């Protein structure tokens, strides 16, 4: 118990240090207006306090109950634990309804098709919700630009520019549909203890350094190391594991996301128009699936998936994460939001983290962040209450708690906080270096955000699944993708 309390105290002190660092080194001093006050009682600092006009009544929405539909991830988990602090100040009760990815997608589809306003706060996936239902989301400019209301701490400029463009806008920047909430990216998880133990033997047999954090760690080396581990597991020499690697391969959104990182690492892309992967578009463009880079990436992805122990129905991201956390695999490609589960599992303290292996062009790490938006079909009173919640839920204090908590560990969406974390926590938290690098422009990859995103992903998932199961080869997959996309447009 004493050890636990010591860790809690250390984490709280660390939070104060980071916020102080932000004030002194990561942000410009901001003059507090005489007619605005801070709230929620956090330590006063020039970057992090939520402000409102002196006459603003924080309890004007007291008694209102909001339903927030959200994916069950680290951010939602921490928010569920912290939300009583928001209720205590405002009198607004928020039910954070966490659910798995597929259920979330189904319920949000039903919500906007029926226009029932069953959920007031929406977890806005830019590739599933923003691209299709932006007209059902409230324009948050109405609240952010209203001088009589609390505003986003630090303003919209405090968020990563590219993440803001992906999560908050559609086609143009006229309307703000959501505020960046989480910022997960694909990274490589690996059993550091196993790699250290067998490093010399791997070097002797493979002829290269197998370290996944090496700048020379390519997809070909990933494949070579995985095969080496599989062979030594089968021979009985390596008893700590069951598999060299696990890669997402089910007929599920996960296979498309896993392939996307491989595609970009070999210099490929889905479309030529850069707006498709940023602000998004209602227009459908010609797909590049017949390009040399695309076909090469398909072939390489099939090689990677073939390392999985058996095909069956394939693996989703949850199944891959569960197997790795149980100590079965040496490496996995997955979202960094799995760090909490991994570091609270039987492999805790034994795991290393890196950006994904390089293709012929670069290491490419798929971005998967989302925002929080307000249902435009909710009542005006609930919309105001929802805005107050968003201001609080995306504040620096809450985002830092999400990073520092035992069940947390993912990066905030604010540029200054990420910079501070990189400077202060790279040694203490083994995942920080990989997470920060994965979001850098030279390593990050943003997938298409289109009005017809559902149709596009359906085509990709179906053909990738058929290919990795051996029903079609990479050439046929590339032809099918192009012809099926053309037919739907």
What are these regions (language model features)?
Residues 127-145, 161-211, 223, 247-280, ...:
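Periplasmic solute-binding protein
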Residues 62-73, 92-97, 121:
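Short, well-ordered beta-strand elements
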Residues 52-57, 73-91, 193, 460:
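Short, polar/charged alpha-helical segment
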Residues 93, 113-114, 170-174, 193-194, ...:
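Extracytoplasmic/periplasmic substrate-recognition and gating elements
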């Amino acid at each position: 118990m004493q050890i636990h309390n010591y860790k809690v105290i250390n984490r709280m002190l660390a939070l104060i240090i980071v916020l102080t660092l932000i004030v002194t080194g990561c942000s410009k001093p901001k003059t507090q207006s005489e007619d605005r006050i801070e709230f929620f009682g956090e330590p006063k600092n020039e970057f992090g306090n939520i402000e409102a006009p002196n006459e603003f009544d924080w309890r004007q929405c007291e008694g209102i109950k909001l339903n927030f539909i959200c994916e069950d991830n680290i951010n939602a988990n921490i928010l569920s634990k912290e939300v009583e602090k928001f209720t205590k100040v405002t009198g607004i009760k928020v039910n954070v309804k966490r659910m798995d990815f597929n259920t979330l997608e189904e319920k949000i589809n039903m919500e906007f098709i029926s226009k029932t306003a069953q959920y007031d706060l929406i977890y806005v996936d830019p590739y599933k919700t923003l691209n299709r239902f932006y007209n059902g989301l409230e324009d948050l400019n109405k609240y952010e630009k209203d001088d009589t209301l609390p505003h986003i701490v630090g303003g919209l400029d405090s968020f990563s520019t590219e993440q803001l463009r992906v999560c908050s806008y559609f086609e143009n920047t006229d309307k703000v549909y959501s505020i960046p909430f989480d910022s997960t990216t694909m990274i490589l998880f690996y059993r550091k203890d196993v790699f250290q133990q067998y490093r010399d033997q791997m070097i002797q047999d493979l002829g290269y350094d197998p370290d996944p954090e090496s700048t020379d760690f390519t997809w070909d080396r990933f494949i070579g190391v995985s095969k080496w581990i599989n062979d030594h597991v089968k021979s009985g020499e390596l008893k700590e594991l069951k598999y060299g690697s696990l890669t997402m391969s089910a007929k599920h959104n996960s296979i498309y996301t896993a392939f996307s990182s491989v595609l970009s690492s070999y210099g490929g892309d889905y479309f030529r128009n850069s707006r498709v992967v940023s602000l998004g578009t209602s227009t459908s463009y010609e797909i590049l699936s017949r390009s040399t880079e695309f076909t090469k990436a398909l072939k390489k992805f099939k090689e990677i998936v073939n390392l999985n122990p058996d095909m069956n129905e394939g693996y989703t991201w949850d199944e891959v994460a569960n197997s790795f956390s149980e100590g079965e695999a040496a490496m996995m490609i997955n979202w960094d939001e799995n760090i909490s589960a991994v570091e609270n599992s039987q492999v805790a303290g034994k795991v290393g983290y890196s950006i994904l292996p390089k293709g012929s062009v670069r290491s490419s790490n798929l971005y998967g962040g989302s925002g929080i938006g307000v249902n435009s079909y909710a009542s005006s009173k609930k919309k105001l209450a929802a805005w107050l919640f968003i201001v609080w839920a995306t504040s620096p204090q809450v985002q830092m708690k999400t990073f520092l908590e035992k069940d947390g560990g993912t990066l905030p969406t604010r540029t200054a906080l990420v910079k501070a974390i990189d400077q202060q926590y790279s040694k203490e938290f083994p995942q920080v270096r990989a997470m920060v690098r994965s979001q850098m422009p030279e390593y990050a990859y943003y997938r298409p955000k289109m009005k017809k995103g559902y149709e596009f992903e359906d085509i990709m998932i179906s053909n990738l699944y058929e290919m990795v199961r051996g029903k079609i080869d990479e050439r046929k997959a590339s032809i099918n993708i192009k012809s099926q996309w053309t037919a739907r447009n």
